[in-house]
Amino acid sequence: MSRDLRLLRTPEELRLQSERWRAAGLSVGLVPTMGALHEGHRSLVRRARAECDRVVASIFVNPTQFGPGEDLSRYPRSLEGDLAVLAEEGADAAFVPAVEAMYPEGAVTTVGLRGPLTEGFEGAARPGHFDGVATVVAKLLVAARPDTAYFGEKDAQQLAVVTRLAADLDTGARIVPCPLVRDADGLALSSRNAYLSPEERHQALAIPAGLAAAARAFAAGERDADRLVALVRDRLERSPRLAVEYVAVVDPDTFAELAEAARGCRIVVAGRMPSARLIDTLRLGFDAPPAVAVDATGAGEAAQRSNPAPGAAEWSRPCSVS
């Protein structure tokens, strides 16, 4: 459903628009993005559209979440196309601020979370990344005052950070996790996939193939985290161009690494191709094994069916860590 899209350029414009909606008794949904929108982003807007009276999506390549040597300068930007996507999906407004509007001269306040949630995995691989994420999300929540905000599960650690931030700061916003979306070949959708060469993309399919192997093993009764991780690594090691950064089974809320898997825990993966860094995740017992058309060795591994494996009804209790 296409509709007129209001363009907002400053936090003050966003705040005033949200106040008008709320004064009229309308619920507000926020979809934060960095642009280069794909089907995963579309799914977030659709979810917001279905649940909220008004939807605003932000398009902002946030410089504070990029570290030295990362891809800030070359991150894909396609504003005209992104605005068309938002209009097609029925968003009511797009918040497209300049860097100077979000971080005016003299601003010295940042937001950060301390502790294990932000120290491992992405926090270790990208120092300062989550401080940048937390700061920009806090600013968006303050300006938009949404009833709900929608985040994809692919960035699972970011989702956990944002959920904790929203609760700790008493923002009143409900953080809604939305399922990861995969391309037809099984690769998790990401704006950075545009960096991949055809050969790199082919080898990157080892990531969803590894997750599929672990999901099937879990469905068959495997609970030892080391053995599940080994199944994933076995697939990844078939891709000579993929440098593995981490594979782990974690609690989805705290990101504590687990020795024993249970239903609802996540397997998280990160690896680096010469042209792009890739992350992926799967919720054990909830997410169906990714359907992968061919493995990274070219050996023609049969496509994995997208239905849960036999035994799924007997998956164990939800994951929890005290």
Q: Which residue ranges define each predicted feature?
A:
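Nucleotidyltransferase catalytic core that binds NTPs
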Residues: 2-243, 248-254, 282-285, 300, ...
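Structural motif
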Residues: 54, 264-266
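A short, polar/charged loop-to-alpha-helix boundary motif
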Residues: 199-201, 290-296
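Conserved beta-loop-beta connector loops within the AMP-binding
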Residues: 257-263
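Short beta-strand elements
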Residues: 260, 268-273, 282-284
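An anion-binding catalytic pocket shared by soluble metabolic enzymes
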Residues: 278
